[in-house]
A protein has these predicted regions:
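Nucleotidyltransferase catalytic core that binds NTPs
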Residues: 1-149
Length: 149
């Protein structure tokens, strides 16, 4: 979880009474942490937000939302390219679950460049990660990176 993710979560939590952060499994990516490890880190980073729950699911998002009784999915957007792919996914989700709407929150300017890939690359050069990652995540991130070397 980056500070950009945390910013979107914090803003969404101020809009909704209950916010579920769903950590999905993406076979196209090779994440540094397992889904359960990411859930644990996100829970630490969002512990100050009482209306936020964090879970992992291997279901399609539209099916997961239906099972949880959710009617809105919140997606963060950094650039036009994010919008194109997320808009397509929102149409697919709507087809699979007609009750589901998608809300797009644009990244704050200071997080527009921020991605997990960029943070991984910067971390290899011993850059101070406090501008990119929540404090509870930095130590675990560095430890995992060092273990991979």
């Amino acid at each position: 979880i980056t500070l950009g993710h945390l910013n979107i979560i914090t803003r969404a939590a101020s809009i909704f009474d209950r916010l579920i952060v769903c950590v999905g499994y993406n076979q196209k990516k090779s994440p540094m942490f397992t889904a359960q490890e990411r859930v644990k880190m996100i829970r630490k980073a969002t512990s100050h937000l009482p209306n936020v729950e964090v879970e992992a699911s291997d279901e399609l998002l539209a099916h997961y939302a239906r099972r949880k009784g959710a009617c809105v999915v919140v997606k963060g957007l950094r650039a036009v390219s994010d919008f194109e792919s997320e808009f397509t996914m929102s149409l697919i989700n709507k087809k699979l679950n007609p009750e589901l709407d998608t809300m797009f929150l644009t990244a704050e300017e200071k997080y527009m460049y921020l991605s997990s890939s960029a943070v991984k690359e910067l971390a290899q050069y011993d850059v101070d990660l406090s501008e990119f990652l929540p404090a509870p995540v930095i130590d675990e991130f560095r430890a995992r990176l060092n273990a991979r070397r």
